[in-house]
Amino acid sequence: MVENQSYYEWLKNQPAQYQDEVLGKTRAKLFRDGGMTVERFRALQLDKHFTPLTLEQMRALEPKAFDKAFAAVVKLDNTKDRVLAVKRTDWGDLPNVMIAHAKDTITTHKHYQKAKSGELSSALFLVDEYLTDDFVLKLHHTIKGYDNVRIVPVHAEEQLGRNKIPMAYALALSEMLGVDMDLGIVQAKRAYRTSSDGVGRLLKRVSFDGVVLSGHHYMIVDDVITQGGTLADLRGFIESKGGKVILASTLNGKPNSAKLPITKATLGQLRKQAGKEIEQWWQEQFGYDFSQFTESEARYLAKQIHRYGIDAIRDILFASRP
């Protein structure tokens, strides 16, 4: 690299194949065609090794630009030792989760494990593989009527390392939709849901922290949806702080997981099977009742009660509370 030459300028002079490998094909095309400005490139918040900078590093490198870009959305605060309540809000008119690839799993893809364990370049390759123009167009039509839209990825630390797929997915959507990505909302408590069974997923709530811009519209994204608990927890945090979640999207998931709001029929069936004791216990433990379960969470719990009996499930829940 030439002395005093920026990484942006240096990368501009590299072969297209190298740019594709570093940025991914979609971003590299924007980069070459002039669609990715220096400001947008910096907004990726990556160093020359394509590793996310810490907030402290970003502030040290360009304090004025950092304060201008993040003063409203980033709170430099240590949440590690604080216990943050998990909130959920009424479902309202939230549409189904939009899933980019629902035909089969992405876990067998050659880049999946590296992306899941913290390699952003692998995550970007993975996103490029499954994100289509037609799907992005559907997202565009869904959000085009809203102003002040921000994309928030789930920051999830799994046991293999820090999962980069949600961030890569958010980066791609941010550029293709022309919507700002917001990294100021962070997961404050690890859940390790990837290796959890259904009951474990129900009990391991995810808390978030950060600054929500009241009155703004949010699109929340994750890599995969199973029961939808993480998205529900993130939505609850944002809406309890004055934001409005207009859409949730994941790169992968089964079609039957796409419906987040619990239906009246499923809620009625769950309450009939579980009785008042378990719902009251849940309300005391987590601060919300069965009406704020996702459809998949409720169906799973009802299925387990039917299979093993209410007494067995009550014992499992009460004994398994983290």
Give the ranges of each region predicted by the language model.
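PRPP-dependent phosphoribosyltransferase catalytic core
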Residues: 74-104, 235-322
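Acidic, low-complexity, intrinsically disordered interaction modules
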Residues: 23, 28-61
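Short connector loops at secondary-structure junctions
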Residues: 181-196
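Short glycine-rich phosphate-binding loop at a beta-alpha junction
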Residues: 147-158
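Active-site-facing substrate-recognition patch
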Residues: 74-148, 192-212, 287, 301
